[in-house]
Amino acid sequence: MLLLCYVKTVRPRKDVLEASMHIPDGYLSPSTCAALYAGSTPFWYVSLQKMKRRLNTQAVPLLSVFAAFSFVIMMFNLPLPGGTTGHAVGVGIATIVLGPWASILAISVALVIQAIFFGDGGITAIGANCFNMAIVGSLVAYAVYRMIAGRAAIESPRRVVAAAIAGYCAINASAFLAAIEFGIQPIWFHDASGTPLYAPYPLHIAVPAMMIGHLTIAGLAEMIVSGGVVAYLQRAEPALLKTTAPGASIGRDSLGWTSLRPLWTALAVLLICTPLGILAAGAAWGEWVPEDFATPQARQHIAAASGNQAPPTQAPAGLQKLASVWTAPMPRYAPPILKSAQLGYILSAMVGTGLIVLAFLGGAWMFGRGKT
């Protein structure tokens, strides 16, 4: 299971319940966002072309459960050394079970729903977030898994090792891309005085800030989870591991809703446990809101997570302009109708899961209708 963990800076603000490494609006220039949308589009197109023939088959339950798993697992924040936290993405296990193209589609759907309905990741940065996590994550996980697993039997321990290493490589590839995207902003996009317009920290700060946690604790956590889930599936449902065998693909022989009941049950348990993710909640590195740049305590946390280099005295102009470009209906997984953060978190997980299922059912209906 590739679980991509992303670093967060912890601060004592209980209202901030965001998943990390989802680049918000205002941190990337419009031209950077446009380039990453353009770079993601061919992969989305190929993914849809490969999957549209199967969306009216039993592939839909598999796509739904692994996209929903990705959504829910990203709500679990884990503490890391140095006052940061990380969380998983689930793109590795999606790749191993679904194959890379179906994984790209599944994880992209989860990320789009997070951005639109929960404000987790910017609308302008959907292309960037999908490119980093869904596209590169899936392709790296697939390449590493296939290279190491080879033609080993489904029940072989070699596949457990392959999954663990695939997760470690994919998490770091995705984190490194995000670090580069953050780090080039002050180099390429600044005003006449040299003041950054978007993400304020250059490469020599952004890369270590993003990578140290991924190369150590988060990467090791991904190895354990990835290998553990594959080991479980080898015993409980080995058929789910056949998609990434040579020549295999997700198709009409995929398991249906009833056959996937154990996975949905496990997902329900995770959903109920999501409030545990609040315990380590905080603002991710590179996800500070404009007000943080003027708040002494927040500025201290930003500097501590950024090589002890103080942030600008005020939020970059581009960030101030774009940060409020979109207001999500359930921002930060905190529905306005609920005062309880715990219940709000659970409700958000339920709503997100439901929206993912509806998205795939709607896609199946649309593509099926086009064939009649």
Locate predicted features.
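Hydrophobic transmembrane alpha-helices
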Residues: 19-35, 39-94
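Membrane-interface capping segments at transmembrane-helix boundaries
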Residues: 48-52, 235-240, 362-372
